[in-house]
Amino acid sequence: MQIHVVKSKIHRVKVTGADLDYIGSITIDEDLMEAASIIEGEKVQIVNNNNGERLETYVIPGLRNTGEITLNGAAARKVAKGDILIIIAYGIMELEEARNFKPSLVFPDEETNLLK
């Protein structure tokens, strides 16, 4: 049997922008993406700690060492600049593999979104 498990998590990052006119996605500082083992185009779940919203979108890389976290397109309506998010990517694996799997967990600086 295969199950869905947390593969990657970027915990408590601050929204730096919301671009309603962009075609969609979330832009994430590429340093954060690499630290969390999230790749361009990967589907992620966004959890907004400020308003309880949850949504799914895909990732595009932002400039390194900027702390950028920008929601684009329709998702921009679900956040405000300064909101705190949790970004989660899931994987599918066999139950036995999942028992020993260790996700990539990233806890950036809560003020700058940069890696500590």
Curated annotation (Swiss-Prot):
- Provide the GO MF annotations for this entry: aspartate 1-decarboxylase activity
InterPro entries, sorted: Asp_de-COase-like_dom_sf, Asp_decarbox
Q: What is its EC number?
A: 4.1.1.11
Modified residues annotated as Pyruvic acid (Ser) in this record: S25
Ribosomal protein found in the keyword field: no
Please state the pathway this protein functions in, per its UniProt record. Answer: Cofactor biosynthesis; (R)-pantothenate biosynthesis; beta-alanine from L-aspartate: step 1/1
Could you name the active-site residues?
S25 (schiff-base intermediate with substrate), Y58 (proton donor)
Binding residue positions for substrate: T57, G73, A74, A75
| Cofactor: record remark | Binds 1 pyruvoyl group covalently per subunit.
Q: Would you tell me the Gene Ontology cellular component terms?
A: cytosol
Q: Where in the cell is it found?
A: Cytoplasm
Q: Name one Pfam family in it.
A: Asp_decarbox
What GO biological process terms does the UniProt entry carry, in alphabetical order?
alanine biosynthetic process; pantothenate biosynthetic process
| Keywords of this entry | Autocatalytic cleavage, Cytoplasm, Decarboxylase, Lyase, Pantothenate biosynthesis, Pyruvate, Schiff base, Zymogen
**What cofactor is needed?**
pyruvate
Please write the reaction equations for the catalytic activity of this protein.
L-aspartate + H(+) = beta-alanine + CO2
The family annotation for this protein states: Belongs to the PanD family.
Which HAMAP family does this entry report, sorted A to Z?
A: PanD (MF_00446)
Primary role: Catalyzes the pyruvoyl-dependent decarboxylation of aspartate to produce beta-alanine.
Q: Which PANTHER family match?
A: ASPARTATE 1-DECARBOXYLASE (PTHR21012:SF0)
Protein's name in the database: Aspartate 1-decarboxylase
Q: Which gene encodes it?
A: panD
